[in-house]
Amino acid sequence: MSGRFTYRLLEQKDIPQAASLYNMSCESGEVVYSPLSEEAFAGAFLQPGMTAFAAMEGEKLCGFVHGTQKVIFLPGETHENTPGYLTVIFVDKACRGQKAGTRLAELLMDAFRHSGKKSAACSEQNPLHLTWRIPGTPGHDHNKAPGVDENCAGYPFLQKLGFETAHHEIAMYMDLKDYAWPDSMTLLRQKLSNEGVCTGRYDPRLGYEFDGMCDRIPSEYWRHVLQTETKAWLEGKPNSDPDLWPDGIRPSGPRPILAATYDDHIVGFTGPVDKQRSGRGWFTGICVDPNFGRRSIGEVLFHLLMQEFADEGAAFTTLFTGADNHARRIYERAGLRVVCTFAMMSKTL
């Protein structure tokens, strides 16, 4: 009990009220997220590894908080060395100013501590991916948020709770009808080819080595993507990892892989080439072997990906990158623009 509210775990019976509160905040522009049906809300917010608390006034739900914990780990990750993830806090307008949001956050932090977590975070590593809408577009969206929208009320609220901003991420957008392959990329691809670096679609039957690149970056994520995508090609099946499926929908089969190769090594990678139901070209990132840096390999791969998206009929693409990341210049030269800024935040428990 705290003032006028009681607090308890969010339950299935609360879904209609919780989804309504969530959707009202989405539709009023308080948050950038896309509205969800009650069924989609329940499917997203009530999964294994998730914790949610409700603030109640009698039978009325006045607010809720939601958090997650990883249940699938990359090499080197454990339950103990990964944070608990704060997903969202919502409080009904009529119930604000009564410390309900603060108490909900405290309950979630206590739950994280009890489960052995040493920190809490708001970042793109959250297993729950919430779609958000690109401002000023005809309903174009992105499949997950990389942190806290710095324009929403939640950002200063979390700062007051002791969350610190570890990193600023910018979300970038391009309508693909505006994309045009630049002649300079044709010349650059030829220059790289003359140096022994081939760029374009990669044939996994070649069996080129990529562990060296992943070790030097270093990135277990990219190792996993390359392992699963090349395996899918060799077996003639779709990628088996649901985390690598756009919209959670199993691909129809192996997908094109774009890579830069040198001798029998993969030294750069982007892809796989795919698109979401919304028409978004599904951008997962670009990696380049540090031993092959400063040769514009990443820029060539990015333009190849944009051309593949356009050829596949994608309507637009979005991505996020560090506000100070030099890759931002690559994306801006290709025609993308900044549409939102997010903060990756963390708090020691």
Model-found features: residue ranges?
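A structural microfeature
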Residues: 63, 167-170, 268, 340
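A conserved beta-turn-beta hairpin within the catalytic core of GNAT-like acetyltransferases
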Residues: 71-86, 96, 115-120, 274-283, ...
